[in-house]
Amino acid sequence: MNIIQQLEQEEIAKLNKTIPDFEPGDTVIVNVKVKEGERTRVQAYEGVCIGRSGSGLNENFTVRKISYGEGVERVFPIYSPMIDSIKVTRRGKVRRAKLYYLRDRRGKSARIAERAERGSDKGKAAPAAAE
């Protein structure tokens, strides 16, 4: 590890932020701090993560949602002080790192299949009842 990577790791450790493990295709809720005049409030922005870029302190992710029939994309720096929290609501099954093709799709064709978790009990049979 070179000096710059080491310094970045130290800065990330100082920030003390817990970032969930999410990938493109996952539906996330990003709670963003919005300053209006003197007061600050938290606004939820929910959408599909369509890509991640960068690394270390400079890592960004793009979230796309449909608002009033219009597609809206927003790029968030992961370690931004304006981000209050990130929550993953749904895991998506995709085969691409960048989901820019979703920009051209509407309705059912823009849906992303849900990814089954490896450690889940959904695929296992129910235990037999003891007699």
Curated annotation (Swiss-Prot):
Coiled coil: none annotated. One of its GO terms (molecular function) is structural constituent of ribosome. Residues 107-131 are annotated as: Disordered. InterPro entries: Ribosomal_bL19, Ribosomal_bL19_CS, Ribosomal_bL19_sf, Translation_prot_SH3-like_sf. One of its GO terms (biological process) is translation. Gene3D superfamilies: 2.30.30.790. It comes from the Bacteria. Keywords: Ribonucleoprotein, Ribosomal protein. Residues 111-124 have a biased composition (Basic and acidic residues). One of its GO terms (cellular component) is cytosolic large ribosomal subunit. This protein is located at the 30S-50S ribosomal subunit interface and may play a role in the structure and function of the aminoacyl-tRNA binding site. NCBIfam families: rplS_bact (TIGR01024). Belongs to the bacterial ribosomal protein bL19 family. PANTHER family: LARGE RIBOSOMAL SUBUNIT PROTEIN BL19M, RIBOSOMAL PROTEIN L19. This is Large ribosomal subunit protein bL19. It comes from Methylobacterium sp. (strain 4-46).
